[in-house]
């Protein structure tokens, strides 16, 4: 009986059901990834932005302070993470609309363009901060290693880099899921 239905040209509803389920799954994955990436960028910006440590030298009454805004690369890192976090929070309603309306092709294209720009900005900020963190842990000809003295400062800035690089991976996955959703239309 099924062979006759296929031969006579009748369409089967079994084939359409998995496509709808896959599109819904892609929309859910997009929404979850945006939320996780927003939390990661927020935590990275907050951790780096509140990083400060003061060291007192006992031989002289001198206090040395290490703070993120002493270095322009770390300031750029905080600004980049804040911008990307704001973008991700503002893009969540569009992601929810893709969950409700699966045919929203134009907004998906716009989100892919902005997602790509945001992953570039976040990568630039994380890369700039990575150089400073590396030089803080290891020394260079012109830099002294400061992590032996400012242990808490170095732990916090290293941790915020981990959150930022994890968010970069999440945004790349968002771009991939959006491209898959666009190719399915």
From Swiss-Prot:
Pfam families: CASP_dom. Residues 1-25, 97-108, 182-185 are cytoplasmic. It comes from Populus trichocarpa (Western balsam poplar). The lineage of its organism: Eukaryota, Viridiplantae, Streptophyta, Embryophyta, Tracheophyta. Its main location: membrane. This is Casparian strip membrane protein 5. Residues 47-75, 130-160 are extracellular. It comes from the Eukaryota. NCBIfam families: A_tha_TIGR01569 (TIGR01569). Keywords: Cell membrane, Cell wall biogenesis/degradation, Membrane, Transmembrane, Transmembrane helix. GO terms for biological process: cell wall modification; cell-cell junction assembly. Belongs to the Casparian strip membrane proteins (CASP) family. The chain crosses the membrane at residues 26-46, 76-96, 109-129, 161-181. It is a multi-pass membrane protein. Homodimer and heterodimers. Regulates membrane-cell wall junctions and localized cell wall deposition. Required for establishment of the Casparian strip membrane domain (CSD) and the subsequent formation of Casparian strips, a cell wall modification of the root endodermis that determines an apoplastic barrier between the intraorganismal apoplasm and the extraorganismal apoplasm and prevents lateral diffusion. The keyword Transmembrane applies. The keyword Cell wall biogenesis/degradation applies. It is found in: Cell membrane. GO terms for cellular component: plasma membrane.
